[in-house]
Amino acid sequence: MVRWHPAALAVVIAIGLVACGSGDKSGTEGGARGSRRFGTIASPCGPGRASGATQLGVTDSTITIGFGDDSAAASSPGLNVEMSEAIRAMIDWCNEQGGIEGRRLVGDEHDAAINDVETAMRSACARDFMLVGQGWLLDDAQERTRLACSLATVPTFAVSERFATAPLMVQPSPDPPESVNAAGAFLLAAAYPTKVRRAATMQGNQPTARAETARVVGAFEQAGWQFLPCEQEYNIGGEANWVPFVQRLKDCGAEVVHFSGSMRPTFEEILRAARAIGFDPIWMQEASVYDSDLAAWNSEGLADNVHFQMTYYPFEQADRVPAVADYLDIMRAAGAPAGLLGAQAVAAFLLWAEGAKACGSDLTSDCVMRVLKNVSNYDAGGLQSPTNPGANLPGNCAMVLRVRGTRYEQVLPSDIAIQACDRTYRVSVGR
């Protein structure tokens, strides 16, 4: 391990002095136009006099960071490619301003194609200073290699419990197994106190899906939800007929259903089956709904009762949230697609860049990790609601969106572009 340099201990970084609202757009010039701000925070990028080949991937003039996705997977072409597109765009955005303390950023892309994550990690270990904004589905398989080469990372997300609680890792939107931001569950319980006492779950027949459902139930029960004994488990590869599943939910008296699984075709077929038997519960989905084509698909109104929690501000609120406007401007200038995972990758990049800037000429991965472990209140300039990356804890703020026609709209809280915050919204669950 590289030793921590004492000079960096004196650095105090103010990352995201935040409130639960979206902030004022005044003073933001737009990220794509070379502005020195991103949302409510000063850009961490710019000229400087940092120098020294302090670690693999660092020279007097450059910093090489790895990033990547699973987009070459034969089973899911293009999987999560928006993360890599976002990191490339942010590298260009940062270099246009002078890099990090004068060092130009060099991107090194690694495509794990789902099953080749260990190969991708070996490649990163051989060349990169740190991994930034990557996300691989089988991240459990990377950890022996990553930790053996002491490769620190600020990923977009963590899938496995092993990686989500690993050393040498800080992420902008922590999701550790024992702590849940259940703000959406609390908000729905306040809005529909009777309905949430007749809730049910539906998930695929995989151990990870069962574990996640148990985690959801444990968290939501603390928000006042009560779950009926009619959990539905389906074949992850699909079912020939979805009517029996939704019929059992209807017969059980479920008024709210928490669904976990793929959007297309699984959830769309379930919604169609529910319409066929006149079953219209509140569906509670995951935030990944926002990145799907569900709203565009919903021309018949089958998804009009689908709700989901968001801790990132939706793109429809760009006129009210400066960070969202800046993110969209940067992606547009780069010709890159905008997406929820892309926004989360940008949050990871900005968090990493703050740490790298703080270290200056003493740039090592230990230095960056030490700086980031002291970040307890981070909102990526208002792109998301506040989290505690240093302690690996999620936030306690969120909004609830729903599908209405072919659009997404905020329904809770009623004040648009405001997230509801309460310390009780973050709950502990058993592992």
For every predicted segment, state its role.
Residues 21-24:
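Bacterial signal peptide processing site
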Residues 78-85, 96-167, 233-243, 264-268:
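Beta-alpha junction/loop-to-helix N-cap segments that form part of ligand/metal-binding clefts
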Residues 174-175, 273-346, 414-429:
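Extracellular/periplasmic periplasmic-binding protein-like sensory domains
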Residues 27-124, 260, 341:
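N-terminal extracellular/periplasmic Venus flytrap/periplasmic-binding protein-like
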Residues 128-232, 282-307:
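Extracytoplasmic ligand/sensor domains, especially the bilobed periplasmic-binding protein
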